[in-house]
Design a protein with these regions (language model features):
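Membrane-embedded alpha-helical bundles that constitute the cytochrome b-like, heme-associated redox core
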Residues: 1-210
């Protein structure tokens, strides 16, 4: 059977990259939200009512998941940026040209997409850099280590990491909503093609046995 609707290698690659981004971002975000809901510190019966509560894993387990899945997310994100670098350069050039000429060739949908992608990229960059800083710079035992105070205090970096993450998650949800049709369309083509191919192989095998 001839499959008329084929998925190009570029589209397939982009879909796989986006799927990897989605999964790693989802796990990193959920584990990050865990830390917002269940802050560290306090004592039993003290001001932190959630002290000592364990959900699936202990806090150290959530920290491990958040850290290493986030590194995986950064790696996939950099790959995504490399493969889409031409689009980034061309879009940036169009924006600066539009500002210079005081006119735009983009419609409202395109401008919204560029704005969301800009917030998404900036949030990713700041969140990733602040996260790497918090990972590399030692906190010290019980948080009593010497703070090197690079630009901000460690608390400042933690706040930057938190709110850039919130901005990234918000933009990612909007981005996902904008491109939901593309995600479903490509997924349907990819998996339908695989199902048809498997059926053809099974039919061919049966015919050969007969």
């Amino acid at each position: 059977m001839e499959i008329k609707k084929r998925v190009s290698s570029t589209t397939r690659r982009n879909w796989i990259l986006d799927s990897g981004l989605f999964l790693t971002a989802l796990i990193a975000s959920l584990s990050g939200i865990y830390f917002l809901i269940f802050p560290e510190g306090g004592y039993k019966g003290g001001r932190n009512p959630y002290y000592g509560i364990q959900i699936i894993f202990e806090r150290e387990g959530w920290e491990w998941i958040h850290t290493w899945i986030s590194f995986g997310f950064i790696a996939v994100g950099l790959l995504h940026l490399i493969f889409h670098w031409k689009w980034v350069v061309n879009t940036t050039s169009r924006i600066f040209h539009s500002l210079k000429e005081r006119k735009t060739s983009m419609n409202k949908a395109s401008r919204l997409n560029v704005l969301v992608d800009g917030v998404l990229g900036l949030g990713f960059l700041i969140c990733a850099l602040s996260g790497v800083y918090l990972f590399v710079v030692p906190e010290g035992k019980n948080g009593l280590g010497v703070d090197p105070m690079i630009l901000f205090s460690r608390t400042g970096w933690d706040l930057v990491h938190t709110w850039s993450g919130v901005a990234f998650i918000s933009a990612a949800i909007i981005h996902f909503g904008i491109h939901w049709g593309w995600v479903v369309k490509v997924a349907r083509k990819m998996f339908t093609r695989k199902a048809v191919f498997a059926t053809e192989q099974m039919t061919l095998s049966i015919n050969q046995d007969i």
